Amino acid sequence: MHLRRRDFIKSSAGAAAAWLALPAVVGAASTGGKPVRNPGKEAYRTSWYPFTGHPDADTCWSVSVGPDGRIYAAACAESIPGGVVKLVRYNEHTDGLDYLFSLDEMVNDPGDSGRATQCKIHYSFAPSMADGILYMATHLSGPPVDQPAYSPWLSWHDPKRCFRGSALVAFDTKKDQVVWWDTLLPKEGCRCLLHDEERHLLYALSYPRDHFFIYDTKKRTRRDVGRIGSINAQTLFLDRKHRVWTTDDYGHLVRYDPERDRLERSPFVLPHNPEFQNGWHSVFYDVAAAPDRESVYAATWIAEPRLMRIWPNEGEWPRVEDLGPATQKRDPTLPKDTFVDHCGGLVFAGDGQLYYVASRWRDPVYNPMPASGPDREGVVWRLNPATLQRQEVAVLRHPTQPAQYVSRGAVDHNGNLFFGNVGTKPVGIFKVHLPASRRKKNAHLPIRIWG
């Protein structure tokens, strides 16, 4: 589709951004997988674990399986002045949460320092199987202890207020201790993190400048490769050739090729709805690698998020399959924000199926949900990679509020799923108990190496 300037100005993207319009060229046509709402005979029980051990926690931006097969989560506190993030681990023996440490204490950057705080870990857990290390990097947004809010632009040159920088922590999951830490990104937060274990390299996207960084874990050195844009993608992924992939502001694939040592942009734009989108803001929100590592499944961070399957090892640029919208039908002439219209938590389970959480909300035309229930909810879907059929298997039930926004998902060594919740307090994580026929030991392997 070639979008003319006049057509774009009429669209919901707005006249102010008309010059951003780009042609929508994708690698494949949409597939016809039909959603199925009845989960059948297999029931998927859910459990809720609030962050009661960290009352200030207001978001959970990261959930990951560690190299030990256990589930780790970030209990973030970004709205309270002086708030800090705590590392949490699910304890399968007590069926509860263990609070391992407050990260500010590990990196000598206390919450009451007067600077912007080490308030969250944002899509930035990255495991290392060889030595049992779980890497994690912090993001910014938490205000100083005596300020109501924090602006990284306003405080960039203020040594008393400026965020010290993303703290990179190496946590030994065998010894339960932090073995070292470093400043990964001075003055900036880490939006997302990836670990190339073979080459001992960490890759990160910075905020607010949206630069692409490489950190050598052996030499403890960092390198700024360059700027991608203004809208951070929310994840990175790695292919068999050790190339790192993400997206730019306009929905193009961006890759870093170590052999060429440069950032490259695809000639096409990722799938989106051409009725009211042109690719702008169609950045990756979440990506999960298929078990054979030949393809990845991705969801975009935009109202009406799109699901897609990408084959990064094929051709000069990957083949991209458009799997269609992740969320329900709606009136495209009416705005809907990305907190309500959302898809996240992509994770492959031991049964070889893709699971993810997509929001659903009350709509008088497209989804007339009962008035007696919540006006929105988070639905756990199972997608069959062979047929691309989607099946609803569970709904996440928060005791006091809707739970439509899931940040990340993970599978533990027992084969059960965990999802991070973002909303109002109390926040925490959900556990989805897979039926015995779909669980297997060490279901987390091969392990996910990006946040």
Regions found by a protein language model. Give the residues of each.
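Loop/turn-rich, solvent-exposed surfaces of beta-rich toroidal or solenoidal domains
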Residues: 298-299, 334-382
